[in-house]
């Protein structure tokens, strides 16, 4: 039997865009013949799936699961909102979330490998690129979850009544804090913002000494704006989230927020341009 080298697997991946495990399996079955492996992958539909791999998958779903003392969020992407509601796509996403819950701490790479065969088969069937993009675990004494549709998912860990922490999870979904408390804001973030604020003050004609004094007040406001407990509570803007938590005898130790497609640049074309491209400009 021919030796299946890492270089051979790499070449097949580059030529087909398929996953590592699929490429290795195809090469083993083809006894190391890369051209035969490609032919077999085309016949099985894996090559079709590979052709979709370069397309932007910025739609999809966020799913949440709660276990004993921990929770998990999973993001699975596809190309269109229509497919995000497809029973096959949603079913696979739920399988992934259930597996992540049952196998606490599973890495995104392990999840992708576990479900690659099913993912490729679904891509071949539906005709859209899709992928398991992110998995986030959160541990805590009490875990609350909130899903906004299937587009935003939040887990909050802390102490107190779960229903109160769920309200805070809803706030996190709406207000996107970066830190739990003002004092948690990193020195690097504070230094960068201070530099920006001093520059703004000096550009307005203030001497540097006065600008630096003005900035101290602005920095206190800034750290409150980017931290959960310093933000006005969306359900009662007259008080901060920190004040609300204190009033219900609860506290937050950490949170995780995922939003479908965040950080992915969507490629958008107008309809006329798309038609012109297809017809070679002879619409």
Curated annotation (Swiss-Prot):
Region of interest (Involved in Mg(2+) ion dislocation from EF-Tu), ranges: 80-83
CC per GO annotation: cytoplasm
Main location group: cytoplasm
Keyword Cytoplasm: yes
InterPro entries: EF-Ts_dimer_sf, Transl_elong_EFTs/EF1B, Transl_elong_EFTs/EF1B_dimer, Transl_elong_Ts_CS, UBA-like_sf
Protein's cellular compartments: Cytoplasm
Keywords assigned: Cytoplasm, Elongation factor, Protein biosynthesis
Protein family per UniProt: Belongs to the EF-Ts family.
Protein's recorded name: Elongation factor Ts
Species of the source: Glaesserella parasuis serovar 5 (strain SH0165)
Source lineage: Bacteria, Pseudomonadati, Pseudomonadota, Gammaproteobacteria, Pasteurellales
Gene (UniProt): tsf
